[in-house]
Curated annotation (Swiss-Prot):
InterPro entries to which the protein is assigned, alphabetical: Aminotrans_IV, Aminotransferase-like, B_amino_transII, BCAT-like_C, BCAT-like_N, BCAT_family
Keyword Electron transport: no
Family indicated by similarity: Belongs to the class-IV pyridoxal-phosphate-dependent aminotransferase family.
One GO BP: branched-chain amino acid metabolic process
Name of the protein this chain belongs to: Aminotransferase poxL
Source superkingdom: Eukaryota
Induction comment from the UniProt entry of this chain: Expression is positively regulated by the oxaleimides biosynthesis cluster-specific transcription factor poxB.
Cofactor(s) listed: pyridoxal 5'-phosphate
Keywords: Aminotransferase, Pyridoxal phosphate, Transferase
Record PTM N6-(pyridoxal phosphate)lysine, positions in chain: K193
Length: 365
């Protein structure tokens, strides 16, 4: 049986374009446990629901020993389901785990666990012609009880899934530079996807939203002169050099390696655009014709303006005559077409998902 024949179709009674990011019940999630004695992760198991049982004295809850990822699965016009760039997410999560002293999940096991979670929840993968996707949340944490600041005896790796629409939508948003709060320290953990980099941003993001700004933008914490990233997305600047397009991506040890940004870089080169990966000075912002917020949740969102209160700066990025942002629109369409099977996957970014039985290892006698 072909994978597309195994998977049930997406339910037609759901308004897929307006499901938002509300947490809802699905068929279950996947769990693996780490064995300290054998220094290995257990085989993935499907667990019903989305709840976990965890010690109140786990280092995950007490010391923030956790790392996570964000990725997506899609359905193509033929009904096949696939995951977008899982190997890159596996590598990034392995790095994040090392930063917070969690045993890294081997790439093969990471991808197998993610694919299993998608497979058992196949009916929650939206139709290919909707604006929604199946969001995937791999999570690893120290789970064994441990009151002192030391390595626990137990670790858990889980994969949860949830159908969602885009976090920020597709219309341009206004950004506010954070000046009262630094997201990370110069030699800190800013290049890891760990909760400690995001929870402190919540109140500042809420304050920005209350003032009408859709997303905070962070400068480097050492000099406040260079662009790091948005609070929940990577930064890309677009420069028009006499008709020649150049995209500029920050090179900083304090930001995560954005999978969407990397996808944009590869696409840009395939278009014949120039690509610069280097530190970006704050003073360069007015030189850009477009600024993009890019990420798994946001995909690609054009920035309408950037405000810096201390300097009373307001940098506006005007749309073209037709109301669009040409580079953002081109990159967005290319990525979405590949993700949904509407365009040729020339980079081999999409990994097909099979029936659940394909992801369980046979038990030896």
């Amino acid at each position: 049986m072909a994978p597309k024949d195994f998977f049930p179709p997406a339910p037609l009674d759901l308004d897929w374009d307006n499901i938002g990011i509300k947490v809802r019940e699905v068929n279950g999630h996947v769990e693996c446990a780490y064995n300290v004695a054998t220094e290995s992760w257990s085989e993935p198991q499907v667990v019903k629901g989305i709840d976990l049982t965890i010690s109140g004295l786990s280092p995950a809850l007490n010391y923030g020993q956790q790392a996570y990822e964000g990725m997506k699965a899609f359905r193509d016009p033929q009904g096949q389901i696939h995951i977008f760039r899982p190997e890159v997410h596996a590598a990034r999560m392995a790095h994040s785990c090392e930063v917070v002293s969690i045993p890294p999940i081997p790439q093969a096991q990471f991808i197998r666990s993610v694919a299993l979670a998608v497979s058992v929840n196949a009916e929650f993968v939206p139709p290919f012609d909707s604006s929604a996707a199946l969001y995937i949340r791999p999570l690893a944490f120290g789970s064994g009880p441990q009151i002192n600041l030391a390595q626990p005896e137990e670790y858990t790796f889980c994969v949860f899934v949830l159908p969602v629409t885009s976090l920020l939508g597709t219309k341009p948003v206004d950004a506010l530079i954070m000046e009262e709060f630094d997201r990370t320290a110069p030699m800190g953990s800013g290049n890891a996807k760990v909760g400690g980099n995001y929870a402190p941003v919540l109140r500042w993001a809420a304050k920005a939203r209350a003032r009408g700004y859709g997303i905070p933008l962070h400068l480097d914490s050492k000099t406040r002169t260079e662009i790091d990233e948005f609070s929940a997305a990577g930064f890309i600047g677009v420069r028009d050099d006499d008709g020649k397009t150049t995209i500029v991506v920050p090179d900083s040890s304090c930001i995560i390696q954005s999978v969407t940004s990397d996808s944009c870089v590869q696409l840009a080169r395939s278009y014949g655009w120039s690509v610069e990966v280097r530190p970006i000075k704050y003073t360069e912002l007015p030189e850009f014709s477009e600024v993009l917020a890019v990420g798994t949740a946001a995909v690609i969102v054009p920035i309408g303006s950037i405000t810096r209160d201390s300097l009373r700066d307001l940098i506006v990025y005007k749309p073209s005559e037709d109301g669009g942002y040409p580079c953002a629109d081109k990159l967005f369409k290319s990525i979405k077409d590949i993700q949904r099977g509407l365009g040729k996957d020339v980079f081999n970014w999409c990994v097909p998902v099979h029936e659940p039985g394909a992801y369980f290892q046979p038990v030896s006698a």
